[in-house]
Structures are given as structure tokens and as C-alpha cells.
Amino acid sequence: MTAAAAAIVSRQQLVLCVDECHLHWGDALGYVWGPQGKRVSLPMTNGQERQTYYGALDVLTGRAFTWSAPGGDSDQTVRFFKALRRRFQGRRMVILWDGASYHRSAEVQAYLQQVNAGGAETAWRIQCVMFAPYAPQQNPMEDVWLAGKTAVRRMWQTLSTFAEVKQGFCAHIEKTIFQFGEKIFHFF
């Protein structure tokens, strides 16, 4: 077993698939059956409401973590990294993510340089590896977002506020253990 694999198995180093998602109030919409030939009326609230989430999927445990943000940008990405470091108590992390422009921004790079303190790559606190360009199918966090939105759609009749939609979305993601097996390991 290599030193890197041993560090991952011993949980000294985490491998996290990271992504951002915009949850919209409309994501909770479902279908309803009604009498044939009659229009069914349902009360509507603001369909424009949305919440941005950053998420991280631990590839070893299958556990996902969500973090709400006002939007997806460089500042929020740095804040998310800080939240990850607090949550995972400063353990080393390999971040697998897409090539969004703010992932490559000067602000994010400056934060990574500060955290990694110019050390050898094998000792970096946070190491970022990009998925192939325009290949969201490589990132299992995309499937986690879909599972959360699907769960919300299945309970749409019980969700009367956007706050309830957000709570249901996050609760489903954080209580589920995701198993992607081959999808994760085809990347390596």
C-alpha cells in the first residue's frame, strides 16, 4: 500500500468530491392528479427563491456535507474551505472538483498557498485536482444533488415553505450514505 493510500484509509487524509448547487423553490414541484377536463389550482409562492449550496462527498465513507452560501464565487469558496477545515479538524484534504473560474481565481489560489505554506505537495493541507473539462458526469457530487432534489420532489405535498424545502434537501443529503463504487475509481 502506498503512503498516500495508507493516509486515506487511516483518515489522516480525506478525498472529497466538491461541487456547488443552486436549489430553487421550483425544484420541489411535483405532479398532481385531478378530475379529467378540470384545471387543478394550487397556491403559488415566489418561484424565484433560491439557495446556493457547496457540498463535499467523502469518497471513503459515502457521507456528504452541505454548506449554504449566498452564491458561488471566490470569496464563498474560501469560506467553504475554512468550513471544511473546521468540520474535518484540519486533516489533509484532496479536493476533486470542476474547473469553475472562481475555483482557479487569484483569491482561492492565495488561500491555498497560505494554507499549504509552500511545503512539498505531499504535505499540502488542501490539494485540488480538477475533473476533465465539461464532464460533470465524473463528479459524484452531481448525483448527490440530484438525490436531494428528487427527495424534495417526492415530499412536495408536505413542503409549504422554501425553508422546509431547504431543510428537507439538506437532511436527505446528510443522512444518506452514498455508494458510487466504480464511478469514483474510474477517475483515478
Question: Whereabouts are the PLM-identified features?
Answer:
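A short acidic (Asp/Glu
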Residues: 26-28, 105-109
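Acidic/histidine-rich, metal-coordinating catalytic segments
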Residues: 91-104, 131-134, 139
